[in-house]
Amino acid sequence: MMTQSIGRSMLTVMATLPLLFSSATLHAQANSVQQQLEALEKSSGGRLGVALINTADNSQILYRADERFAMCSTSKVMAAAAVLKQSESDKHLLNQRVEIKKSDLVNYNPIAEKHVNGTMTLAELGAAALQYSDNTAMNKLIAHLGGPDKVTAFARSLGDETFRLDRTEPTLNTAIPGDPRDTTTPLAMAQTLKNLTLGKALAETQRAQLVTWLKGNTTGSASIRAGLPKSWVVGDKTGSGDYGTTNDIAVIWPENHAPLVLVTYFTQPEQKAESRRDILAAAAKIVTHGF
């Protein structure tokens, strides 16, 4: 639980700090980050999960990073990546057209609704899902793959034993406290996002496409991005659901520094609670200070 996560976090935060500092200074700085995250969480009235990976040395900053949180639309990254993986062996796959019917529309379809009685390519569906969080696009990607369990199977193929997708949009966003469906942990998601965008989980062309989609996201300006210097390049995917669940996962390219991978998950005790993107921005500012 939290004690284990904080203890683990303190060790990994310390690993990111310059070796010239005394151990006392290292401990003080690690404590400061943890105390700031704990204070932020306490003031919010919710539960906050954070995982940051510094790819310069693979050190980590973790807070409740091994606890499960509902992914909501951050799960769209896994579905889109699974389709990209298929395209490695079928160079024409992303041009495959998918019919869009009025009956396909769900609660949020800013792109798909413009194509009712027409078609969209799998590439267009991937872009709509990741850059506009289009729920019909996500459902079409899931259907193409063969169901939510196939998205989970793709995660397993990457070595991610934590991710699980059980439902489609919009029911995957219920975010009921204690419900394991459609959840992961901040650390598991951070490790997988790193593998997908900066590692070898995808071939170079597919990896570049995923990064391009994430950099073009239109929904994240008030979340992680809001807590970072404007000169930093960010690719991210947001998510939100019941219980005020507010999420963002990002790959960050600071100036003159190796990329950072950051996952921020937040949820609240009341089902009708409002989203709190400001909490994600504040968490991002805390954990990236000094980079």
Swiss-Prot record:
Signal peptide: 1-28
Active site: 73
Xref: PROSITE patterns: BETA_LACTAMASE_A
Binding site for substrate: 237-239
Gene Ontology biological-process annotations: beta-lactam antibiotic catabolic process; response to antibiotic
InterPro entries linked: Beta-lactam/transpept-like, Beta-lactam_cat, Beta-lactam_class-A, Beta-lactam_class-A_AS
EC number(s) on file: 3.5.2.6
Alphabetized Pfam families for the sequence: Beta-lactamase2
Keyword Repeat tagged: no
GO molecular function, one term: beta-lactamase activity
The entry's keywords: Antibiotic resistance, Hydrolase, Signal
UniProt xrefs under SUPFAM superfamilies: beta-lactamase/transpeptidase-like
Reactions catalysed according to its record: a beta-lactam + H2O = a substituted beta-amino acid
Catalytic class of the enzyme: hydrolase
Keyword presence, Electron transport: no
Purpose: Is probably capable of hydrolyzing cephalosporins such as ceftriaxone and ceftazidime, thus conferring resistance to these antibiotics.
UniProt family annotation: Belongs to the class-A beta-lactamase family.
Record's miscellaneous remark: The class A beta-lactamase family has a specific amino-acid numbering system, sometimes called Ambler or ABL numbering and often misspelt as Amber. A multiple sequence alignment was used to derive a consensus sequence and then the consensus was numbered taking into account insertions and deletions. This allows use of identical numbers, e.g. for active site residues, despite differences in protein length. UniProt always uses natural numbering of residues, hence there appear to be differences in numbering between this entry and some papers.
The name this protein goes by in its record: Beta-lactamase CTX-M-97
Organism field: Escherichia coli
